Design a protein with these regions (language model features):
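Conserved pre-motif I regulatory segment
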Residues: 1-40
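Pre-Walker A (Motif I) flank of P-loop NTPase domains
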Residues: 31-37, 58-59, 107-109, 166, ...
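Walker A/P-loop
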Residues: 32-51, 61-64
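Conserved helix/coil segment N-terminal to the catalytic DExD/H
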Residues: 43, 50, 91-134, 143-148
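Conserved strand-helix element at the start of the C-terminal RecA-like helicase core
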Residues: 60-70, 224-231
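Conserved helix-turn-beta segment of the N-terminal RecA-like "Helicase ATP-binding" lobe
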Residues: 71-105, 182, 186-187
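Post-DEXD/H (motif II) to motif III coupling segment of the RecA-like Helicase ATP-binding lobe
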Residues: 128-137, 141-197, 215, 219
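Conserved interdomain hinge at the start of the Helicase C-terminal
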Residues: 205-231
Length: 231
């Protein structure tokens, strides 16, 4: 597509401007760089890979461990007129085969997959036929043995890079400097490109209350708050 990143953002998402650091991440990806983005939850990580993927030919492979999020994002993209697919653990072999066939030979922009899928022979067979624009790694801290949520299946992404000549966009909301270095090494970054924002959330306030009856205090707070919340 012959649109700028900002024009693409406006066309498909309706936003007039990027959030802090989003445009830096998008531009780095468009320059064919491997990039690790550390953004807080709610920081707009999806836009950071969806915009550049819409500006490049081919299909972006999005690796995510969260099936519910996978389905929500595919539905959201389809609602915007962007063709997207997903392969998850709840699908039978025939449905998986059909989905991967469509990803390889159809006109789709995004394929969401779980990390467990990457090592299967069927996936590896079809991925060789795909014109892959980007490899997107969501929850990228899961690839690091130094991270709090290490998942061995994420190590398959390194093998995927042997089959696909495409830059990596890795995203996480949490990574220490040690974990960030480990992520970039395990994903085979050609150059270190780390972009991160601060984690201050101006829409949140913090209150510390000293009390003896913690349960009673909690019940009082819950009874005074209307709507939903997290305890």
């Amino acid at each position: 597509m012959n649109m700028t990143a900002l024009e693409t953002l406006k066309e498909f998402w309706g936003y007039d401007s990027f959030r802090p650091k989003q445009e830096d991440i998008v531009n780095s990806a468009l320059e064919w760089k491997d990039v690790l983005a550390i953004l807080p939850t709610g920081g707009g990580k999806s836009v950071c890979f969806q915009v550049p993927a819409m500006m490049r030919e081919g299909i972006a492979i999005v690796v995510t461990p969260l099936i519910a999020l996978m389905k929500d994002q595919v539905q959201n993209l389809n609602d915007r007129g962007i063709r997207a697919l997903c392969v998850n653990a709840g699908m039978g072999r025939r449905e998986v085969d059909l989905t991967l066939n469509n990803a390889a030979y159809g006109d789709f922009k995004f394929l969401y997959v779980s990390p467990e899928r990457l090592g299967t022979s069927l996936f590896r067979q079809y991925v060789r036929e795909m014109n892959v624009s980007f490899i997107v790694v969501d929850e990228a801290h899961c690839i690091s043995q130094w991270g709090y949520d290490f998942r061995p299946d994420y190590l398959q992404i390194g093998k995927l890079r042997e089959l696909v000549d495409a830059p990596v966009i890795a995203l996480t909301a949490t990574a220490t400097p040690q974990v960030a270095e480990d992520i970039m090494e395990r994903l085979g970054f050609k150059e270190r490109c780390l972009i991160k924002t601060g984690f201050e959330r101006p829409n949140l306030s913090y209150i510390v209350r000293m009390c003896e009856d913690k349960l009673g205090q909690l019940l009082n707070i819950c009874s005074s708050v209307k709507g939903t919340g997290i305890v």
